[in-house]
């Protein structure tokens, strides 16, 4: 498995990303189905760990999992005007079934606000039925024109939460709770990816939403990636689907609803935040295999002694570490080292006859490729040493990504400075422009306002585009 399979980031960043997806065995383009991918075992194992950590957080905030139909009557999509306009180009329709034309076409789920809204209108009658807090894990389809594995595909996998509340304040509280306690917490603690928490502009918000909040991350090419969104839908979908309830005063009111989701594009964020020119780098908490052991021997006698030591060593790891012993005799140790490095396994343990005699092992850490990350350590206390090292690596990856983002983020005061800064990263600027101004900037620079950060400086400055005074800052960047 030669190193040349990975294009260097400095040569072609896009090809580097595609090479890692392929060589780390994460996914394969499904060329027989336009815009779709096959998520392979290693990629799906990462997604399963993400699901588990997210699901725990979602349930801890009082939500239950449900499952709604994949097919949605087209008339449902047409009920909410902004929603229709936002999703019309991406919708895939089913018009025939059982050899006949359907009386009404179905839309393959692009998102589920409409069909869930229909059922909520049946289930909610009284204020006693609120809040209704549901989440579903599902696949969705959006007919994307330009696709890239994990980052943008026609079919992808996600969770989508949908809740209904008695008041706007409760819906807003829910929207922000998900943003902070579920999404930002997960992405920073599990993925080791620092995020900016913010509000979307009117131009960038979810179609049909009252307000959209997001978390934005910086990739190694300086571009932004939207890692999660949480929407306060106001009463727009409640009015479209007649989601009403009788309040404590026996008055009929429309419910206030929210929706929020993250998807398999987080795997793309993971790749582009931490990986290097040697291959995939995974934060230990999301590594399907945290430790790989490569036994080294030349004959049956050596094999017996080495494997006895390996079995004794790994017995203490069960239930504490996710590990694999790579004792395949059909591949050389060098091949195995390269393979597991490509796949991003955080820690590699090498053990041969000399190590058995000395009661030591060679330990290589993935976040420090080459000699810098390799050391010889005693077998005694190895379990605790590895656990401490994994925790150190998790923190180190986050701090490294945070330092990178800070180094690539700059305050700009003029439009020329903005255009220069977005070539290398995030531009932070005061903003008092209109949606039309936003569109012009995007047309001229291909950059968008990623968010209005929730943390504001509390000072006044002049808008980078209009020159008007404002106390609001925004983040401009090119994005995936």
From Swiss-Prot:
Gene Ontology biological process terms, A to Z: prolyl-tRNA aminoacylation
Molecular functions per Gene Ontology: ATP binding; proline-tRNA ligase activity
GO cellular component, one term: aminoacyl-tRNA synthetase multienzyme complex
Keywords annotated in UniProt: Aminoacyl-tRNA synthetase, ATP-binding, Cytoplasm, Ligase, Nucleotide-binding, Protein biosynthesis
Record's subcellular location: Cytoplasm
Description of its domains: Consists of three domains: the N-terminal catalytic domain, the anticodon-binding domain and the C-terminal extension.
Stated name of the protein: Proline--tRNA ligase
Record organism: Chloroflexus aggregans (strain MD-66 / DSM 9485)
């Amino acid at each position: 498995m030669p190193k040349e399979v990975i294009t260097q980031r400095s040569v072609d960043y896009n090809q580097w990303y595609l090479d890692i997806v392929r060589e780390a065995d994460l996914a394969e383009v499904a060329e027989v189905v336009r815009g779709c991918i096959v998520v392979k075992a290693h990629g799906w194992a990462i997604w399963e760990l993400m699901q588990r950590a997210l699901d725990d957080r979602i349930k801890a905030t009082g939500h239950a999992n449900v499952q709604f139909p994949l097919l949605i009557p087209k008339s449902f999509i047409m009920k909410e005007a902004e929603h229709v306009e936002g999703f019309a180009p991406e919708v895939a329709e089913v018009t025939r079934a059982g050899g006949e034309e359907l009386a009404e076409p179905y839309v393959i789920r692009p998102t589920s606000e409409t069909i869930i809204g229909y059922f909520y209108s049946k289930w909610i009658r009284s204020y006693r039925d609120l809040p209704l807090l549901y989440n579903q894990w599902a696949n969705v389809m959006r007919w994307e024109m330009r696709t890239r594995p994990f980052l943008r595909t026609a079919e992808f996998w996600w969770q989508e939460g949908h809740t209904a509340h008695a008041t706007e304040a409760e819906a807003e509280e829910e929207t922000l709770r998900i943003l902070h306690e579920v999404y930002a917490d997960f992405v920073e603690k599990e993925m080791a990816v620092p995020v900016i928490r913010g509000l979307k502009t009117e131009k960038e918000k979810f179609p049909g939403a009252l307000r959209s909040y997001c978390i934005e991350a910086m990739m190694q090419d300086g571009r932004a990636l939207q890692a999660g969104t949480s929407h306060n839908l106001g009463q727009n979908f409640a009015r479209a689907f007649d989601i009403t309830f009788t309040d404590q005063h026996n008055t009929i009111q429309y419910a206030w609803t929210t929706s929020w989701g993250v998807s398999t594009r987080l795997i793309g964020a993971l790749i582009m935040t931490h990986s290097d020119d040697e291959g995939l780098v995974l934060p230990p908490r999301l590594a399907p295999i945290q430790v790989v052991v490569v036994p080294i021997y030349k004959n049956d006698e050596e094999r017996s002694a080495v494997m006895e030591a390996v079995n004794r060593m790994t017995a203490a790891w069960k239930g504490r570490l996710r590990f694999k012993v790579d004792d395949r005799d059909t591949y050389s140790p060098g091949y195995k080292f390269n393979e597991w490095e490509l796949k991003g396994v955080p820690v590699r343990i090498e053990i041969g006859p000399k190590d058995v005699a000395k009661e030591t092992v060679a330990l290589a850490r993935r976040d420090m490729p080459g000699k810098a990350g390799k050391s010889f350590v005693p077998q005694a206390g190895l379990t605790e040493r590895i656990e401490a090292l994994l925790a150190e690596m998790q923190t180190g990856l986050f701090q490294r990504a945070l330092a990178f983002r800070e180094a690539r983020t700059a305050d700009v005061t003029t439009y020329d400075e903005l255009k220069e800064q977005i070539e290398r990263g995030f531009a932070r600027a005061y903003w008092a422009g209109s949606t039309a101004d936003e569109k012009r900037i995007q047309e001229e620079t291909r950059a968008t306002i990623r968010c209005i950060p929730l943390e504001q400086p509390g000072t006044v400055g002049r808008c980078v585009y209009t020159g008007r005074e404002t106390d609001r800052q925004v983040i401009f960047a090119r994005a995936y």
